[in-house]
Amino acid sequence: MLGMVARSRGDHAKAVDCFQTVLAAWPEDFFLRTELGLSLLSLGEAQQATEHFRRACELTPDSESVWFNLGEALWQQARGEEAVAALQRALALEPRQIQARISLARAYAGLGRAEAAVAELREVLRLDPDNADAWYGLSLNTIFDAADTAHLQQLFARTDLPARAHCLLGFALAKALEDQHDHARAFDALREANASQRASMRVKWDAAKERRFVDAIRNTFANAVPPSPDATAGKEAILITGMPRSGSTLVEQILASHPDVEGANEISDMLQLVDAESRRRASMFPLWVAVATVEDWQRLGHEYLARTARWRASKPRFTDKNLLGWHYVGAALAMLPAARVIIVRRDPVETCLACYRHSFTDVAGFACDLDDLADYCAGFLRLTRFWLDEYPAQVFDLQYEALIADPEAVIHRMLDFCGLPFDPACLEFHKTQRAVLTPSASQVRQPLHRGSARSARYGDKLDRLRERLQDAGVQLE
């Protein structure tokens, strides 16, 4: 009971403690296994959660919900084929389980099976024609026709929709209107969808706070930070960061196509370590950096490598992609002096528009407003320039447009920077079979092409964004 109360309040760490205590007395209770697994999953401990979900499946093999939970946990670990098998088992037990079918579609998309993903989402809409998650999922995986667009317009006009559904349908409608070449109305749908998303966020974006954070990081790392004394620490790690929708998933897919590199997808071990250190010191990052010793950085580096060991089980190098990682480049290199960092940049207007077209969680609250996006982008570029100046041998500046224009040359330079021999598989990245957990899954299954730019189609709708970027010191081409 105490575990259930703690989980309902969002105190998942306490819930885990409660469920583990009770489970010691009743280890064969599938309900306790399930609740413990769900609490662990909420803490980002998908591997531990999987163990409990597997046991729950053994105890109650005819329960579709436990197979669904297992599929979710496996997917969070990028174990795509296993996730598909678990979700298929859930649907075999209950074919009308909508959420399992949506999750299966997501897994298919992440594995490059776009047609199968679309088929599952269309089946969801056959069962539930107004399902917002299915419509949004389709927007990431297919081109809408006029009939889809008309249906979405009718749905979006309804006044009885929950806020989340209204938001997702707005993004889907915008994509449908783009597919019909009606960018003026697409922008109106985006504006309304983002306003709805912004209003429903639990934590409101604070642009001034973000500016202070970026300034504090620059000021802190402008003073020499003594790194870990182990100069070879982190030689296994290739850290990838950048703004959302800027090409970081593409860069990871290229690197993961190399026979010596494991693509870990988006992982949060570095950020979790920094947060844990901040709690331990009762001091926010980057305030404690000034008093951190070389032994502290060495300890943190060892912890990071221990946490990420699973990604080096079969290959010597791995990618760690995190879209908040650009704040922590200095900390990462203090922990891991031999690591390599790739910061991906894309045309600022294209980047901001791509973010504005996508539904994010509270973490990316800046994406709901073009003014906030401009400020966030300016801060990102300002700190990126700082990292490139401070760590020229350890940080690689990858311009998305340069990669598109001359992929072979840029990929050669990137591999050289990472200390990797050239491999032609990196040029054939779209053929690499692996689970991709981000919304860019379908794009990285295609060869590089120059047709990804969209901002010109929106014309003067983006003039304010351009002005705001220029006012913040961002140079536009």
Question: What function would you assign to each model-found segment?
Answer:
Residues I240-G242, Q253, N265, F318-N322, ...:
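Short beta-strand segments
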Residues M1-R312:
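Alpha-helical solenoid repeat scaffolds of the TPR/TPR-like class and their adjacent stem/linker regions
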Residues Y328-V329:
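Long C-terminal interaction/binding lobes of large macromolecular proteins
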Residues A86, S246, A354, P439-S440:
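Short linear Ser/Thr-Pro motifs
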Residues A332-A354:
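Conserved phosphate-donor/acceptor-positioning beta-strand/loop module used by diverse small-molecule
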Residues Y136-S139, T149-D160, L169-A237, W288-A292, ...:
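PAPS-dependent sulfotransferases, especially Golgi type II membrane carbohydrate sulfotransferases
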Residues V261, A339, V395:
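Short, conserved active-site loop motifs that form the nucleotide-linked donor/cofactor pocket
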Residues S268-M270, P348-T351, L403-I404:
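Conserved nucleotide-binding/hydrolysis micro-motifs of P-loop NTPases
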